[in-house]
Design a protein with these regions (language model features):
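Catalytic cores of nucleic-acid ligases and guanylyltransferases
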Residues: 1-320
């Protein structure tokens, strides 16, 4: 019986500026999910990036790979993704599945998953890590595994970084990964041959409060509490923003917000318990950059304070 090795630690992409000339590179979508390696032999086993065995968590992926490979042996590398009703990846949905080591029919139906496969590092007794990216992709395509819940993640060539960023932003995806066409698979290495680039969204937000800073800068501005108006005209809390502010910006905002303080929150219920929060009249508008909105802003940062902006016209961003 052929012995299939356990999956190695996956190759990782570097966070670096994309090259000005992308000749010789291939673009892939950056999925907002969890890295998954599939060891496909007599039975299929699934492993996380940290080598945790997740086989029982995702039985639909196991069944689909068993049927699709028809007895062939392989180690596949990809991303496990949960898509919301807008067809956009939603990381919170995957978290629900991870909390259930043996999901029941109801959870399987309510949170379906997709395994987006983007690499193959072993096939029918052959180690493919020394093959080039394009060679491995052709072998992966030849397996014809593209049947839900398995998707062969597409790749693109001959496109610029700005155009690719715009496409990813339009699709509501996290960003893209650039992979050199001649790169070999380097297990466990964060390689410069793969470059990840996160595409971020921008949106005006209304400041409804702030949290003073603690520690060395006690009494200064720690974080802004921001929100936007729903269709009923109520100000909804969207999150706190502490990144992206220079000392000068913090000082000028603190001076401005201090004059706008009021005893009651301007945000409609429910809002989380925000220790030390100070509330203000919702007249200041700021430009916020963020990765994703899921009812809360993910990885927000302040870009600028908008002068003379009408705070009443700031609506909630779409989720996803």
């Amino acid at each position: 019986v052929q012995r299939i090795p356990l999956p190695p630690a996956p190759m990782l992409a570097s966070a670096a500026p994309p090259p000005a000339d992308t000749t010789g590179y291939c673009f892939e979508a950056k999925w907002d999910g969890i890295r998954l390696l599939a060891r496909c032999a007599e039975r299929v086993e699934l492993f996380s990036r940290q080598a945790t065995n997740l086989t029982t968590c995702f039985p639909e992926i196991v069944d689909a790979l068993s049927a699709g490979l028809e007895g062939r042996t392989a180690i596949l590398d990809g991303e496990l993704v949960a898509f919301d009703h807008h067809a956009r990846p939603n990381f919170q949905l995957i978290q629900r599945r991870l909390r259930a080591p043996r999901p029941g029919p109801r959870l399987l139906a309510s949170v379906p998953l997709t395994f987006c496969v983007f690499d193959i590092i072993y096939l029918d007794g052959h180690d493919l890590t020394g093959h080039t990216y394009l060679q491995r992709r052709r072998m992966l395509d030849d397996l014809r595994l593209h049947k839900p819940p398995i998707v062969i993640s597409p790749y693109w060539t001959g496109i610029g970084t700005d155009a690719m960023a715009e496409i990813m932003r339009g699709l509501g995806l996290e960003g893209y990964v650039l992979k050199h066409a001649h790169s070999t698979y380097q297990p466990g290495r964060r390689s410069a041959a793969w470059i990840k680039h996160v595409v971020r969204q921008r949106r005006p937000m209304v400041v409804g409060g702030f949290i003073p800073s603690a520690g060395t800068h006690r009494g200064g501005l720690g974080a802004l509490l921001v929100g936007a108006y729903d269709t009923n005209g109520e100000l909804r809390y969207c999150g706190h923003v502490g990144a992206g502010m220079t000392p000068r910006t913090r000082a000028s905002l603190m001076e401005r917000l201090s004059d706008l303080q009021q005893p009651l929150t301007p945000f409609a219920a429910p809002i989380p318990e925000l220790r030390g929060a100070r509330w203000v009249r919702p007249t200041v508008v700021v430009d916020i950059e963020y990765r994703q909105f899921t009812g809360r802003l993910r990885h927000p940062a302040l870009k600028s304070v908008l002068i003379d902006a009408d705070s009443s016209g700031i609506s909630l961003p779409p989720e996803g």
